Design a protein with these regions (language model features):
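N-terminal non-catalytic structural scaffold regions of very large proteins
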Residues: 1-240
Length: 240
């Protein structure tokens, strides 16, 4: 229903875009609570059924199918309807392959001054297990080739996007096409310059991802002797 609101011409254009954001927020909450609860139930080997009589694995499979279809629909609405409509109103989002030479120079300077100093690559190897990344944060997993400054062979690394920076940045007016206000994505800037964060190494792949963590409270007051302590433990686990 929320997605259909994004297609309704009766709503102002930015409100229609907002409906896509609401849909994403709703999906996050659904996966944090409902899907997380199902996965926890499956992990415990609990095959108790719901009111509809279906097993947890069957419910999870159906959720996956429906969610994938809805996400595809969401991006169709964004790319085929809303972004062209925004562009017709003079608002444009520049992809990496659309940057002009002057825009690339501006992005390079911004990356050097504002992004590189606050981004901390995390190596992945047997001595460094997968890190505890912040819930719903933007990250990149990077495939590397070559050796670093310490002579270590390349492998995999994670780039957490700085949370102190906005996801969208406006290009200076003199760099925009005539009649347009243009923006670039933080993710595009990191992707374009990821190799500069690994001197002496070659980036063979750079892939954007985010984690949605379990936010379902799983404390049973009948099974713990100290409910307050159990709740504190659950809350401490939410630091990420």
């Amino acid at each position: 229903r929320v997605l259909e609101q994004a297609l309704d011409d009766a709503h102002p254009l930015l409100n229609r875009l907002m409906f896509l954001l609401i849909f994403s927020s709703n999906m996050d909450e659904f996966f944090e609570i409902r899907v997380a609860g199902l996965k926890h139930q499956i992990a415990l080997g609990d095959d108790s059924t719901g009111a509809d009589g279906r097993l947890p694995k069957a419910v999870l499979a159906e959720i996956s199918e429906i969610a994938h279809a809805q996400i595809v629909r969401q991006y169709e609405i964004l790319n085929d309807t809303l972004l062209p409509a925004l562009e017709a109103q003079g608002l444009r989002f520049r992809r990496r392959d659309q940057w002009t030479k002057a825009q690339k120079d501006w992005v390079q300077e911004l990356f050097n001054n504002d992004i590189m100093p606050v981004i901390s690559p995390i190596g992945l190897d047997p001595s460094h297990p997968f890190p505890r990344l912040v819930n719903k944060s933007l990250n990149f997993i990077v495939e590397l080739e070559g050796k670093d400054a310490f002579g270590r062979a390349g492998g995999m690394a994670i780039l957490p996007a700085p949370r102190s920076l906005p996801r969208l940045m406006a290009l200076p007016k003199h760099l925009c096409s005539e009649g347009f206000t243009e923006y670039v994505f933080l993710s595009s800037m990191i992707h374009a310059h990821a190799e500069e964060l690994f001197p002496g190494m070659k980036v063979r792949g750079c892939y954007q991802f985010r984690l949605t963590r379990n936010a379902d409270m799983s404390v049973d007051p009948e099974e713990v002797s100290d409910l307050a302590s159990a709740l504190r433990g659950e809350l401490l686990a939410r630091r990420y």
